[in-house]
């Protein structure tokens, strides 16, 4: 049996679409040398067969937390034969079982695990018995875990090093017991700030060089994308991807200003929809309360939310949900902590100006 060669319609300006995707990890990262070196030093013991400290990587959305974590672990895998890495999105795998299952699945250890009947402790036992390469476990969006105690479980296993990624330390610490708070506070912290416009320009220029034909976008246009993204690399790359995709579909030879004008709004809408689709069930209920009745304060939101469910989460958890949705521009908050109110995000966000 012979395989037919698959041919694709050629792009007009996109040379490598992978480079424009949000999850792409480049061979070189821009303006994060200190953070890369810090995280690498935390993980170095595992390359010598020794336990490594847990690392906590924090910063606003779009500051490169996931990218840097994956970049460092990929570099480790290239340099050391007996080190592996696995990635878990805790927003998607938000229960203790799902997270443990995902890790074991990456190890090929889930053949006889039944989602409905296998107890959690058996999954931990399997991780304790795992005798494969030492492994770095990246827990992305770790503050989304329903039971953050899993961090303690993994931390106690010397075969694994753990990277915890979250927007804010306080959102993570507020939901764990004193034992784990003490452990986390003694962990190594890698903090990432929003990018400056000049740094975003360099990140965009690197993506253009790797993914697009020459001379399809100007330096001035990259500056305007950086300005519209306001320090958020994910949004900046999203604007570039949206503009390049539209120009390519229309068989343009370059990205024109008229295409760029609408790209920011389209990219924001795509990111917002992706974030909405990622909400776990109780977060979605909280969002619906704000959509139906907002603007509302946290106590009012909680009262409405409680009427919708039989097993409501705690007030503290709902406040964490509100904080998370604000960080990801699903909701917006106005006022001080005493009189704060939440509402849907205003859709009239800045565009890429001419």
UniProtKB/Swiss-Prot annotation:
Write out the residues that bind ATP. Answer: 63-67, 195, 207
Quote the SUPFAM superfamilies the UniProt record gives. P-loop containing nucleoside triphosphate hydrolases (SSF52540)
Name the InterPro entries on file.
AAA+_ATPase (IPR003593), AAA_22 (IPR049945), Cdc6_lid (IPR055237), ORC1/CDC6 (IPR050311), P-loop_NTPase (IPR027417)
- What Pfam families does this protein map onto? AAA_22, Cdc6_lid
Name the GO terms of the biological process aspect: DNA replication
Q: Does the keyword Nucleotide-binding apply?
A: yes
According to the UniProt entry, its GO molecular function terms are:
ATP binding; ATP hydrolysis activity
Per the entry, what this protein does is: Involved in regulation of DNA replication.
Q: Which family does it belong to?
A: Belongs to the CDC6/cdc18 family.
Protein name per the record: ORC1-type DNA replication protein 9
């Amino acid at each position: 049996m012979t395989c037919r060669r698959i041919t694709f319609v050629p792009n007009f300006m996109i040379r490598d679409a992978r480079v424009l995707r949000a999850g792409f990890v480049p061979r070189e990262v821009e303006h994060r040398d200190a953070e890369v070196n810090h995280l690498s030093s935390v993980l170095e013991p595992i390359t010598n067969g020794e336990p490594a400290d847990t690392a906590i990587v924090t910063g606003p959305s779009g500051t490169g937390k996931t990218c840097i974590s994956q970049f460092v672990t990929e570099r480790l895998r290239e340099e050391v034969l007996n080190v592996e890495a696995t990635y878990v999105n805790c927003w998607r795998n938000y229960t203790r079982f799902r997270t443990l299952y995902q890790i074991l699945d990456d190890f090929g250890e889930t053949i006889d695990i039944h989602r409905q009947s296998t107890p959690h402790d058996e999954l931990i036992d399997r991780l304790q018995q795992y005798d494969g390469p030492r492994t770095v476990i990246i827990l992305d969006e770790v503050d989304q875990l329903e039971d953050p105690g899993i961090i303690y479980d993994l931390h106690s296993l010397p075969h694994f090093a753990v990277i915890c990624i979250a927007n804010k330390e306080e959102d993570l610490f507020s939901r764990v017991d004193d034992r784990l708070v003490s452990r986390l506070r003694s962990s190594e912290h890698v903090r990432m700030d929003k990018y400056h416009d000049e740094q975003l320009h360099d990140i965009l220029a690197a993506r253009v060089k790797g993914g697009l034909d020459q001379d399809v976008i100007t330096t001035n246009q990259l500056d305007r994308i950086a300005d519209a993204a306001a320090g958020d690399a994910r949004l900046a790359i999203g604007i570039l991807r949206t503009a390049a995709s539209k120009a390519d579909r229309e068989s343009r030879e370059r990205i024109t200003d008229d295409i760029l004008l609408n790209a920011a709004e389209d990219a924001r809408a795509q990111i917002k929809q992706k974030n909405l689709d990622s909400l776990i069930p109780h977060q979605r209920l909280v969002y619906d309360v704000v959509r139906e009745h907002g603007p509302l304060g946290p106590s009012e939101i909680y009262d409405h939310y409680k009427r919708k469910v039989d097993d409501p989460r705690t007030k503290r958890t709902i406040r964490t949900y509100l904080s998370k949705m604000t960080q990801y521009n699903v909701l917006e908050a106005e006022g001080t902590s005493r009189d704060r109110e939440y509402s849907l995000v205003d859709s009239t966000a800045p565009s890429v100006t001419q």
